Regions:
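Short hydrophobic/aromatic-rich motifs at helix boundaries and adjacent loops
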Residues: 68-69, 85-87, 119-121, 183
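Glycine-rich hexapeptide-repeat left-handed beta-helix
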Residues: 5-11, 129-225
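Conserved short-loop catalytic and cofactor-binding motifs
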Residues: 36, 86, 104, 138, ...
Length: 225
């Protein structure tokens, strides 16, 4: 295993401004600037998800009752299908032609673009999911941003918390070093068309470029690359 590189020195330290330029959601998700999230396209993904409930509430205020069935802080597009037994907790927006299966659990401020699928037993927490992405079944995705056409096979997980160590702060890999996000809860940013095989795990802080494939049963941990 290669030696862990932690960015601490003045030479290798990436300041906040450089991080925002280097880790842009728009570099991973092509359609973000034309989406409802366009105003936040220049945020880092951890900035976006760290305030997910309020951001979803802001989007809720702009929706039309003509197209969405709104109940409290939950909005479901009239073309979406939500099966009996799904658990929905607001704030939450479910977009056009989405399918939410029985046993799915959505909570903590989530936004789903069009044609998304959240399968049986899948849990989505404080996350933003772009068009055509699918959580097959028995998945967990926490505090994450998934690009368009992302697919998670059965049992694949995106972890959002470093419970294995005393310092819970999540790091991301930028260039040849690690950068602290300053957050204790951040899962991953998955670019358009990324794929996670069955029972694969992405550790907190993953930044997966468009088209990345993580094989079945594999662990991707940016701190061990």
């Amino acid at each position: 295993m290669p030696a862990l590189t932690v960015v601490e020195s003045d030479v290798n330290f990436y300041d906040e401004k450089e991080i925002k330029v280097t880790v842009r959601i728009s570099d991973y998700i092509h359609g973000v600037t034309q989406s409802a999230l366009a105003r936040w396209a220049n945020l880092t993904p951890w900035e976006l998800v760290s305030d997910a409930p309020e951001r979803v509430r802001e989007l809720l205020r702009q929706l039309s009752d003509e197209h969405y069935q709104v109940s409290g802080d939950i909005a479901v597009h009239r073309t979406a299908q939500v099966e009996d037994g799904a658990i929905l907790k607001g704030p939450l927006i479910i977009g056009p032609d989405c399918f939410i299966a029985a046993g799915a659990y959505l909570r903590g401020g989530c936004w789903l673009d069009e044609h998304c699928i959240i399968g049986p037993g899948a849990e989505l927490k404080s996350s933003f999911v772009f068009a055509g992405s699918k959580l097959a079944h028995f998945n967990f995705v926490g505090d994450s941003v998934l690009g368009a056409g992302v697919n998670l096979e059965a049992g694949s997980l995106i972890a959002n918390y470093r419970n294995e160590r005393a310092d819970k702060t999540v790091n991301v890999r930028v260039g040849d070093g690690l950068v602290s996000t300053g957050c204790e809860k951040f899962g991953a940013l998955l670019g358009d068309g990324a794929r996670l095989g069955a029972n694969a795990v992405v550790a907190p802080g993953g930044l997966l470029r468009p088209g990345t494939v993580i094989r079945r049963l594999a662990l991707y941990d940016c701190e061990e690359v």
